[in-house]
Every structure is written in structure tokens, then in C-alpha cells.
């Protein structure tokens, strides 16, 4: 069965809703535009099925905001109904460009602030969404995945806290250590590898790059990231081998 037909044969888990927080607003717009175009172009025989109600829409974005009181405390607000929705909340905890005012002083949002806003939006859903998924380009507290002394296991605590609030799936990219999934073994956890994208734009953006043993060295910043250089090396090796075969 062709790939597109295989996806068409499945029934949506619920009405799709994308909730991009302020830190991920531009990415959310691009994802929304892609989904609108992709679903508009698809043809399938189940369009009249009740399960496909709302399958094609002008936008899948659910309006949400995280305003703050004068004291600096915040709250999460969903401006649209999400009852029965399959929600995908997008947040970039490393976006330091977002600012807020506190006591007349402008502050930049820290990863802790972004994480707090994420929990507020989940709480605003009030258990009415059919499923809640969280997409984070950078896994919050991923570097604190193990103990080397009297330390808190913040990454595991964060994952357990989100799943306790009703999150079913967590999607991230190149997690520092994907084995942190052990803290929530019965929930969905996806760490998407970005090796192809890194190599692609490295080759497109660096004109004088020579991929060979004489001119290139891949260095890991720490022990936890040792897997990435290995992936880059093997991917580059396969790429060069493929290009050599094409040229020959």
C-alpha cells in the first residue's frame, strides 16, 4: 500500500489543534501552512465520515495566550474550545528573545519561564482535550539526566510532571540522552535525529568544506553527546560513497 494511502486509511484520533506558544509562533505558522496545504490537496473517500469532521480547515491553530499580572505571576488562556481535540502544543524553551515587564524592568524569559507557561496552557485545557502532545525542539533540562552527586533529576521530574498532567506524547529533537524515556516508559517519547539537516546545510553553506581525514575532525563537547559525531561521520561517509558511485 502506498504511503499516502496508508495514512488515509487511518481515522484521526481527534480534531487536530496546534497551540504554538509565543516562543514558537513563527514555527507554528509554518507548520500550520504546511498542514493546510497538504490536507487540501489530499483526496480520500472518507470525507463525509463523521470522524473526519473538521479535517480540512483554513487553519489548525488554537489561539492561546500567557499574560502576566503586575506581580509577575502568569496564567494560561485558551481562547478557542478544544473539547475532543488532538492538541499539539509547541514550545521553545531556549527562546530568550521573549520579554516581559516586572516592576518596571524588562526581563528575558528563561527556560523555567517557558516551561511554566507550557504547564499553564495544559492546565487551561482542563482535561477537555482528547489527547495532549508536546513538541519541543530542545528537551527542557535534558542535560540534567543523571546524578553525579547530591543532585536533582530535573529531566525525569519534568517528564513525569507533564505525563501526570495528561500529556500522552513528547516529541523533541536530538535529545541529550534519549534513555531518559525510562522515567516514563508507558508514555510516548520521540527524539527525532537531525543528522541529515545538519549535514545538508553544512554542505550548502560552507563552500570550502572538505570531508576527508586530512581536513575534517568532528568533536563532541561532552561525553553525553558522543553519539552525534559518530552519526555525522557515518552519514558523511555514506554520502561521499553515494556521490562517488554517481560520478563514476
Locate predicted features.
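PRPP-associated nucleotide enzymes
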Residues: 1-248
